[in-house]
């Protein structure tokens, strides 16, 4: 049984993407730059190849962080921060150019949107790991992933109901990424220790401000940065997402309860991982941040992918039970950690083994969804994806029309 039904197939044929980027920086600075960049790509290069190439930059960035700081609590060489910044800039550029290439080659389709947003969902995890390397924040890296994942999920949820993806005047894909790669480049000059030491040492001006309730507590600068990101970006964005969805639901005389139910799988994911980490006898968040973030990142990607597919196929609003498939595995490590609590800290199964299995499960589930949906949309729309021969040339990835005839 496939992921797309007969109604979904007909909807895909009529689907048209609607989006708006209200960022002033994007409009007057980056858009002209991206418009020039797209001319550097040959017309035969499919948009999805550009998307995939941009995503691999972040995978490489996370890999560098793992090689030089496996627990993300030691300072990597300075050039690694420079590489993090450059690779993130390239990712942002390629992510913006792929859509322009699709319009340039008249190859836009729902599959391109799904492929692009699917890579972006996974990118949250890989860039969080790169940022964790730069901030030297260890287990706190998971919280930085959360700062990216929450607005991303809520924006996808809002898009599901409003049918238009609106990026506000200041948004994550533009100004947010710019701040992050500037932080990487800044760390190339200062060193990662600047973020990991007490914020009053990094910013001496705060040493003059009387804070009696914090005078005996050492607070790393990255914790202050995390709080500022939550208060200044995440909370306002979430409030806007909920408000926009509520406005649309009320205008259609729908149920806000059904709308909010679609957030439950994401809440269940965060709750399950949080319970596992709090009970963990081996402190997995501190000792294995890469495996934890990657496993949860692919879990998150699966949830986002199912919601995007539901939007593309105009499925009924409400909870999607299939989304809980990605959460089933979390029952085992939680039970294993509970057993350790009553067994003098000795789990039945080594947590490193469970973490590896968790990653394998979520990666496998995500790839199954991705490959299946690619083939189903390809057949539904009569397009090729990832590889095709056009006029004697082999196209390695992307979306190209099927030639007429047999």
Predicted regions and their residues:
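C-terminal membrane-associated helical module and adjoining short loops/tails
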Residues: 1-44, 148-406
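N-terminal signal-anchor/initial transmembrane insertion module
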Residues: 10-77, 81, 91-93
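Alpha-helical transmembrane segments of multi-pass integral membrane proteins
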Residues: 23, 87-88, 116
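Juxtamembrane helix-capping/reentrant segments at transmembrane boundaries
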Residues: 39, 102, 106-119, 167-170
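Alpha-helical transmembrane segments and their helix-entry boundary regions
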Residues: 47-50, 109-113, 141, 176
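Membrane-embedded alpha-helical segments that form the functional core of polytopic membrane enzymes
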Residues: 54-111, 127-128, 139-151, 222
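Membrane-interfacial alpha-helical segments at the cytosolic side of multi-pass membrane proteins
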Residues: 59-64, 122-134, 181-188
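Alpha-helical transmembrane segments that form the membrane-embedded catalytic/substrate-binding core
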Residues: 98, 112-128, 172-179
């Amino acid at each position: 049984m496939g992921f797309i039904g007969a109604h979904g197939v007909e909807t895909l044929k009529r689907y048209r993407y609607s989006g708006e980027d209200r960022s002033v920086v994007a409009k007057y600075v980056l858009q002209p730059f991206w418009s020039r960049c797209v001319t550097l790509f040959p017309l035969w290069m499919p948009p999805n190849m550009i998307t995939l190439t941009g995503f691999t930059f972040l995978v490489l960035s996370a890999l560098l962080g793992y090689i030089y700081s496996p627990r993300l609590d030691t300072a990597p060489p300075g050039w690694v921060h420079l590489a993090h910044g450059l690779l993130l800039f390239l990712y942002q550029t390629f992510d913006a150019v792929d859509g322009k290439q699709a319009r340039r080659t008249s190859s836009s389709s729902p599959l391109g949107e799904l492929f692009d947003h699917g890579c972006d969902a996974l990118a949250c995890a890989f860039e969080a790991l790169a940022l964790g390397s730069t901030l030297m924040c260890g287990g706190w890296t998971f919280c930085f992933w959360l700062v990216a994942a929450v607005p991303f999920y809520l924006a996808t949820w809002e898009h599901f109901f409003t049918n238009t993806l609106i990026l506000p005047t200041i948004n994550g894909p533009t100004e947010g990424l710019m701040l992050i790669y500037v932080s990487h480049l800044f760390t190339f000059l200062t060193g990662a220790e600047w973020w990991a030491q007490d914020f009053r040492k990094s910013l001496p001006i705060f040493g003059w401000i009387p804070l009696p309730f914090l005078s005996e507590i050492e607070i790393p600068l990255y914790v202050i940065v995390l709080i500022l990101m939550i208060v200044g970006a995440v909370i306002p964005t979430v409030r806007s997402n909920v408000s926009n969805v509520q406005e649309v639901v009320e205008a259609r005389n729908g149920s806000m309860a059904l709308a909010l139910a679609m957030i439950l799988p994401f809440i269940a994911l965060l709750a399950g991982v949080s319970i596992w980490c709090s009970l963990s006898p081996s402190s997995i968040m501190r000792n294995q941040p890469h495996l934890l973030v990657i496993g949860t990142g692919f879990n998150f990607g699966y949830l986002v992918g199912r919601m995007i597919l539901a939007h593309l196929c105009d499925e009924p609003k409400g909870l999607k039970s299939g989304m809980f498939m990605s959460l089933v595995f979390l029952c085992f490590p939680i039970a294993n950690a509970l057993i350790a609590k009553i067994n003098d800290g000795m789990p039945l199964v080594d947590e490193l083994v469970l973490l590896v299995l968790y990653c394998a499960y979520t990666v496998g589930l995500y790839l199954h969804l991705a490959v299946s949906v690619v083939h189903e949309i390809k057949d539904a729309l009569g397009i090729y994806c990832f590889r095709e021969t056009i006029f004697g040339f082999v196209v390695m990835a992307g979306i190209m029309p099927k030639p007429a005839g047999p």
